[in-house]
Amino acid sequence: GISETVCDPSGVEQLEVLTVDEPTISMTFQVNDSPFAGVKDRSGGKFLTSRQLRDRLTRETQHNVALKVEDTDDADKFKVSGRGELHLSILIETMRREGYELAVSRPEVIIKEIDGQMMEPIESLVVDLEEQYQGGVMARLGERKALLQNMEPDGKGRVRLDFMIPARGLIGFQTEFRTITAGTGLLFHVFDHYGPKADGAIGQRQNGVLISNGTGPSPAYAQIAMQERGRLFLDPGEEIYEGQIVGIHAKDNDLTVNALRGKQL
């Protein structure tokens, strides 16, 4: 087991006990209940049931010691907690490649009440980037409640910035960071401590989504008409279902669209 010491009986001396970081992020894993669940051409999933999902998650906790799995009021849903987005995303991708089909909720930070005060996980964040992108990154991190601790230019056009930031401020930020820095920035973060929960929402998406109003194949004609509304996720003729997110809206509100409209001949 973790932190157990194997030694000669004549000289028993236990090594220092390892401390396993507590989970800071949780997600709900559940049985895939979409209309395409189990459809081979869509997912290729082999393991679809809650029992199979439970067994796989239970096996994972035997060697992934920082992972925590809990039952919920719904037999088809499990609360899975880990050390961050990357920790859980690796598990999800591994399960997908193994043939497990599942749905997941958006990640949420684990809030604790300590001495009557609501506390949230605070991360130590280090970014290394070209000076020309410094302003944009600092502005976005400021919106996510990050506090600058230190700044060190290297004299060669790059700068290192140290921040303290709520863990929820990092959710979804890595993709945004790569976009701002044109892929040249480096980002590292690690859990530091629990601190007072910051007021207000953090890291809300800037754009709404495009939602299909029906089920069936989405023709190219309909997609051409939708392109002026935002960026699509679809290929011409792709099968979709009612309620499916088919793109990112150019504005900040969600919009239901007709993704099935064909050309009148």
Q: Residue locations for each model-derived region?
A:
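Accessory interaction regions appended to the cores of large information-processing enzymes
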Residues: 1-265
